[in-house]
Amino acid sequence: MLEELLNGNIEKKTITQIYGPPGVGKTNICILSMLNAIENGKSVVYIDTEGSLSIERIKQLSGKNCEELLKNIIIYEPSTFEEQSEALEKIFLLENIGLIIIDGIVSLYRLELCDNINENTKLNRMLGKQISNLLKVARKKNSGILITNQVKDSANGIEPAGGRLLEYWSKSIIKLEKAESVRKLTLEKHRHAKEGENLRFRILQNGLEIINKSY
């Protein structure tokens, strides 16, 4: 799916960010990107911060017995932002990693924000360190990075959560929207592909159906 929009695979050694509201289909796209990496002979790290990853959905989208597929997926399910940091540290020890996915990059971060300035400063530093470690491990392993992000209200409607830090370090940013049964991916930022391109699709039980691609 993302390959269609980006005119190629997810770029190595950089961050690709997909943002959109809950239930719009971000995890489905993560699973398809994961399956594509596995088909290319690589393993995938999947950090699931929101409990969105479903083994049954992997089976539906792969159309195969997923026992063999699961051998190539390293899944982490952190319940705190500190555990998310620890999961990223563990990736340095893994081999043959083609793609690192964090489904809900700031979900746990936002849960732990509070009225204490010192605690929030600590969280911001931890987020910065996580982004740094992500890029270090991706460059070391020659891996792609795919993150999903929540949205927040802004003067222009909605925008990605996580502030300018995630916006700056994400070399590709893709907005995912939903109108009834149709979803739309829009490429908002990219170093090589044409910004503004969009792809409309439907989510089916056994996959995603592309409706059209426009510019």
From Swiss-Prot:
Recorded family membership: Belongs to the eukaryotic RecA-like protein family. RadB subfamily.
GO biological process: DNA recombination; DNA repair
Function statement: Involved in DNA repair and in homologous recombination. May regulate the cleavage reactions of the branch-structured DNA. Has a very weak ATPase activity that is not stimulated by DNA. Binds DNA but does not promote DNA strands exchange.
MF term (GO), any: ATP-dependent DNA damage sensor activity
Pfam families according to UniProt: Rad51
Species: Methanococcus maripaludis (strain C7 / ATCC BAA-1331)
SMART domains in alphabetical order: AAA (SM00382)
Record has Flavoprotein as a keyword: no
Entry keywords, A to Z: ATP-binding, DNA damage, DNA recombination, DNA-binding, Nucleotide-binding
Encoding gene per record: radB
Name of this protein: DNA repair and recombination protein RadB
